[in-house]
Protein backbone atom coordinates (compact mmCIF):
# COMPACT_ATOMS: atom_id res chain seq x y z
CA UNK A 1 0.00 0.00 0.00
CA UNK A 2 2.86 2.34 0.83
CA UNK A 3 4.30 1.85 -2.66
CA UNK A 4 1.01 2.95 -4.23
CA UNK A 5 1.08 6.24 -2.30
CA UNK A 6 4.48 7.05 -3.79
CA UNK A 7 3.84 5.61 -7.23
CA UNK A 8 0.51 7.31 -7.92
CA UNK A 9 1.82 10.91 -7.67
CA UNK A 10 4.79 9.98 -9.86
CA UNK A 11 2.49 8.53 -12.53
CA UNK A 12 0.24 11.59 -12.41
CA UNK A 13 3.23 13.90 -12.78
CA UNK A 14 4.54 11.90 -15.72
CA UNK A 15 1.19 11.99 -17.52
CA UNK A 16 0.89 15.75 -16.92
CA UNK A 17 4.36 16.29 -18.38
CA UNK A 18 3.43 14.25 -21.44
CA UNK A 19 0.29 16.31 -22.04
CA UNK A 20 2.27 19.55 -21.78
CA UNK A 21 4.55 18.34 -24.62
CA UNK A 22 1.65 17.14 -26.77
CA UNK A 23 0.67 19.60 -29.46
CA UNK A 24 -0.91 19.77 -32.86
CA UNK A 25 0.51 21.34 -36.00
CA UNK A 26 -2.13 24.07 -35.54
CA UNK A 27 -0.74 24.79 -32.05
CA UNK A 28 2.77 25.17 -33.43
CA UNK A 29 1.51 27.37 -36.26
CA UNK A 30 -0.28 29.61 -33.73
CA UNK A 31 2.81 29.83 -31.54
CA UNK A 32 5.24 30.65 -34.35
CA UNK A 33 2.72 33.14 -35.79
CA UNK A 34 2.31 34.90 -32.45
CA UNK A 35 6.09 35.13 -32.07
CA UNK A 36 6.37 36.50 -35.62
CA UNK A 37 3.61 39.09 -34.94
CA UNK A 38 5.57 40.29 -31.92
CA UNK A 39 8.44 41.04 -34.33
CA UNK A 40 6.38 42.11 -37.39
CA UNK A 41 3.08 43.88 -36.77
CA UNK A 42 0.30 42.35 -38.83
CA UNK A 43 2.17 39.17 -39.72
CA UNK A 44 -0.02 36.46 -41.25
CA UNK A 45 1.47 33.06 -42.11
CA UNK A 46 1.60 32.25 -45.80
CA UNK A 47 1.63 28.74 -47.24
CA UNK A 48 2.85 30.28 -50.51
CA UNK A 49 5.91 31.83 -48.80
CA UNK A 50 6.45 28.53 -46.98
CA UNK A 51 6.43 26.63 -50.29
CA UNK A 52 8.94 29.08 -51.79
CA UNK A 53 11.17 28.72 -48.71
CA UNK A 54 10.97 24.92 -48.93
CA UNK A 55 11.98 24.91 -52.61
CA UNK A 56 14.58 27.68 -52.38
CA UNK A 57 18.24 26.88 -52.99
CA UNK A 58 20.30 28.58 -50.27
CA UNK A 59 23.68 27.28 -51.37
CA UNK A 60 25.26 27.36 -47.90
CA UNK A 61 26.20 23.70 -48.27
CA UNK A 62 27.05 21.99 -51.54
CA UNK A 63 25.54 18.73 -50.26
CA UNK A 64 22.43 20.31 -48.70
CA UNK A 65 21.59 23.45 -50.68
CA UNK A 66 17.83 23.20 -50.04
CA UNK A 67 15.22 21.50 -47.86
CA UNK A 68 14.37 19.37 -50.88
CA UNK A 69 17.89 17.91 -50.89
CA UNK A 70 16.85 15.48 -48.17
CA UNK A 71 13.07 15.86 -48.06
CA UNK A 72 12.35 15.60 -51.83
CA UNK A 73 10.22 17.97 -53.90
CA UNK A 74 7.09 16.39 -52.40
CA UNK A 75 6.87 16.75 -48.59
CA UNK A 76 4.26 13.98 -48.46
CA UNK A 77 6.92 11.49 -49.60
CA UNK A 78 9.72 9.94 -47.55
CA UNK A 79 13.17 11.40 -48.03
CA UNK A 80 16.75 10.37 -47.38
CA UNK A 81 19.54 12.33 -45.69
CA UNK A 82 22.12 13.17 -48.35
CA UNK A 83 25.09 12.75 -45.99
CA UNK A 84 24.10 9.84 -43.72
CA UNK A 85 21.75 8.12 -46.20
CA UNK A 86 19.27 7.55 -43.34
CA UNK A 87 15.60 7.43 -44.33
CA UNK A 88 13.49 10.43 -43.33
CA UNK A 89 9.74 10.18 -42.76
CA UNK A 90 7.55 12.59 -44.74
CA UNK A 91 7.45 16.19 -43.51
CA UNK A 92 3.78 16.79 -44.19
CA UNK A 93 1.51 15.91 -41.24
CA UNK A 94 -1.04 14.58 -43.75
CA UNK A 95 1.44 11.79 -44.57
CA UNK A 96 3.13 11.59 -41.17
CA UNK A 97 0.75 12.44 -38.30
CA UNK A 98 3.66 12.62 -35.82
CA UNK A 99 5.06 15.75 -37.51
CA UNK A 100 4.75 19.00 -35.59
CA UNK A 101 3.14 17.41 -32.52
CA UNK A 102 6.05 18.16 -30.18
CA UNK A 103 7.32 21.74 -29.87
CA UNK A 104 10.70 20.74 -28.43
CA UNK A 105 11.28 18.29 -31.27
CA UNK A 106 10.18 20.81 -33.92
CA UNK A 107 12.46 23.48 -32.45
CA UNK A 108 15.37 21.03 -32.30
CA UNK A 109 15.02 20.13 -35.99
CA UNK A 110 14.40 23.71 -37.10
CA UNK A 111 17.55 24.69 -35.21
CA UNK A 112 19.68 21.97 -36.73
CA UNK A 113 18.33 22.08 -40.28
CA UNK A 114 18.13 25.85 -40.59
CA UNK A 115 21.78 26.21 -39.62
CA UNK A 116 22.87 23.48 -42.05
CA UNK A 117 20.72 24.52 -45.02
CA UNK A 118 19.91 28.22 -44.55
CA UNK A 119 23.15 29.07 -42.74
CA UNK A 120 21.43 30.70 -39.75
CA UNK A 121 18.52 30.26 -37.36
CA UNK A 122 15.16 30.49 -39.10
CA UNK A 123 12.93 33.35 -38.02
CA UNK A 124 9.57 32.76 -36.35
CA UNK A 125 7.93 34.06 -39.56
CA UNK A 126 9.81 31.51 -41.67
CA UNK A 127 8.81 28.72 -39.28
CA UNK A 128 5.16 29.82 -39.36
CA UNK A 129 5.17 30.01 -43.16
CA UNK A 130 6.86 26.60 -43.38
CA UNK A 131 4.30 24.95 -41.08
CA UNK A 132 1.48 26.73 -42.96
CA UNK A 133 2.79 25.25 -46.21
CA UNK A 134 3.09 21.74 -44.81
CA UNK A 135 -0.34 21.81 -43.16
CA UNK A 136 -2.25 23.76 -45.77
CA UNK A 137 -2.60 26.56 -43.21
CA UNK A 138 -4.52 24.38 -40.75
Where are these regions (language model features)?
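Bacterial N-terminal signal peptides that target proteins for export
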Residues: 1-8
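Bacterial N-terminal signal peptides
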Residues: 8-15
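Sec/Tat signal peptide C-region and signal peptidase I cleavage site
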Residues: 17-22
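Electrostatic cytochrome c docking/interface patches
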Residues: 24-59
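The canonical Cys-X-X-Cys-His
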Residues: 62-74, 130
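Short cysteine/histidine-rich zinc-coordinating motifs and their immediately flanking basic loops
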Residues: 79-86
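Short microdomains enriched in Cys/His and/or Lys/Arg
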Residues: 88-104
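C-terminal capping alpha-helices of c-type cytochrome domains
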Residues: 107-138
Amino acid sequence: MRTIHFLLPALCAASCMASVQAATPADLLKGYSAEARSQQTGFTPSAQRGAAFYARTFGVSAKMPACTSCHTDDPTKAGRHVVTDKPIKPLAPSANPERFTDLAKADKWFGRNCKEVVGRDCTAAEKADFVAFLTGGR
